[in-house]
Amino acid sequence: MKIKKKERQRLLMELLEGNPFMTDEELSAHFGVSIQTIRLDRMEQNIPELRERIKDVAYKQRDSVIALAPEEVFGEIVDLVLEERAISIFDVGPEHVFERSGIARGHHLFAQANSLAVALVNNEFVLTAKASIQFTRPVRVGERVVAKAEMAGKGSGRTRILVTSHVNQEVVFTGEFAMYQQNETEERPQQ
């Protein structure tokens, strides 16, 4: 049964409030209409395209990070629940890859995962004490890396965080990070 335009637009707004990362293609399949119809519906409802929705979510999350200044975060944090989970997005550009092969330099994938692990800890003073990482496939220029971090345990001044990075649902990087955080009774280093 076909949904009327006004009802579809209302449902579209509700759906994107719950999941702002849905593509026009996914929305088209969800509602059983053309991509052009979805784009017209978005325009009529003043709903920005995916890239702008991602930037908006990232902007709203920037003040939640305690240990890093916004410019110190590698990738765009799009979801953050301190001490629970976090998600960031990193678009691989020509400046991130080896010139001859077009393959992303590993330290960029590590930086995305590491800054996500630091951001997840609810403390002003957080350092990576140990990291065990694995690259599972090369990432190429133009690909979007979505890193998901979750807290796996906490104790004795250390927090264990697991990070998995994907490109189009395919795992490209995994890491287990032991994060050190200074407790309130320790003296802070002088700046």
Curated annotation (Swiss-Prot):
Any GO BP: negative regulation of fatty acid biosynthetic process
Q: Which GO terms describe its molecular function?
A: DNA binding; DNA-binding transcription factor activity
**Residues covered by the MaoC-like domain:** 102-169
Write down the Pfam families for this protein, in alphabetical order: 4HBT (PF03061)
Q: Which residues form a coiled coil?
A: none
Which UniProt keywords are present, listed alphabetically? DNA-binding, Fatty acid biosynthesis, Fatty acid metabolism, Lipid biosynthesis, Lipid metabolism, Repressor, Transcription, Transcription regulation
Give the HAMAP family listed for this entry. Answer: Transcrip_fact_FapR
* Homology family: Belongs to the FapR family.
According to its UniProt entry, what is the function of this protein?
A: Transcriptional factor involved in regulation of membrane lipid biosynthesis by repressing genes involved in fatty acid and phospholipid metabolism.
The name this protein goes by in its record: Transcription factor FapR
* Designated gene of the protein: fapR
